[in-house]
């Protein structure tokens, strides 16, 4: 891998700047990693790096809200570590990722956080942040959540409603976690599947002799995702706190989110590249390896309408920002479940191809405008997780994370050319038109001419303050609701014996 001089200074000439609210032709000057000037005809200073972006778009660096790099999971570890994973990210135009700290049940949140941060700090090639999963509940967890928010830069906590006997929390635990999130100004996130019913469905499939990858989707149908999504939103609304549903994979779950949003509930939905780019019919492929490669949770749905409908929701703003749930396992790891689909490590790729998949299926189909694309792949995530406009916008004072995007250049996605460590790509053979030709992180070119020039460990941890825009109006809303909750003044109840004895 090439090493570059990290000056953080670059001048981009003749491009079209695209933010989520407007686009315009301009030059962009980045100095010391920060955008210094945006105007036409900027004269380059002596010795400065100049890049010509004629006929190209200048986009805010992509933000992937959902990755799992080097995750210990289901008896193995995902093969895209923080080095390889962030190389793949920048090769596709993503310059910021938010990974998940996932403590084991009973483990200290702070201990797990410190481990994840150490792994990341040593390897990341772009800036990053960390969500933290809550896999159990106690007074210790409550105290450690406060420390994470106030001292460690965390403003989001995830609950699993699935993975029974592992990560799954009960509804009562989730209620208390949501209350604590509200107190701390952190957004509650939810993996929404009915874990008890999934557990029973898995037993049923195995009893019927369905042991292959198709059993994965059959045991956790769309209805279980939709039901859990509704339940999570109802619980969050009872607490009056914002909730963010991760990896929305089904029409049913998206419908539920849309319904509650129309009723004024503060809920956010995250579709992922897999669900927007392919369908789950691959799990019925006769090649076991091929079928197993598509196993993730919630499943990619086999209904071929799903990816189009999810894109429609994204275009309307009923779903918010696109993540990937990038969690990759090679063939020998997936083969742990060759005789039992419940043992197939769940996870697929996506961090490298996310932006091109959204462009191909959104912009190129006429469903998304350029500005809506930026909203879906960058700016809305920055707002929700309270790092806007530092991230998610091209403007003076913002971080110099910029993608030079060629809307007319094509490529065919393949495991043979991708930058992941995994030996399979779920988007294999898909031709996309619209790709990142140059990726700039903090003013430094890290991807250009189909070559990476990253510096391992050069990325920075970005703390995310609490009480972001998702909490706007929450206090007043809660106050108004509570004013409607009044007791009825009435005389003490007296039965006939009491009445007679008082005479």
From Swiss-Prot:
GO CC terms in record: cytosol
Spell out the reaction equation it catalyses: 5,6-dihydrouracil + H2O = 3-(carbamoylamino)propanoate + H(+)
Its domain of life reads Eukaryota
For this protein, the record's Gene3D superfamilies field holds:
Metal-dependent hydrolases (3.20.20.140), Urease, subunit C, domain 1 (2.30.40.10)
According to its UniProt entry, one GO biological process term is: pyrimidine nucleobase catabolic process
Annotated positions of the N6-carboxylysine modification = 158
Q: Where does Zn(2+) 1 bind?
A: 66, 68, 158, 325
Q: Is Repressor one of the keywords UniProt gives this record?
A: no
According to its UniProt entry, what is the function of this protein?
Catalyzes the second step of the reductive pyrimidine degradation, the reversible hydrolytic ring opening of dihydropyrimidines. Can catalyze the ring opening of 5,6-dihydrouracil to N-carbamyl-alanine and of 5,6-dihydrothymine to N-carbamyl-amino isobutyrate.
Q: What is this protein called?
A: Dihydropyrimidinase
Q: Where does this protein come from, organism-wise?
A: Dictyostelium discoideum (Social amoeba)
The record's gene field reads pyd2
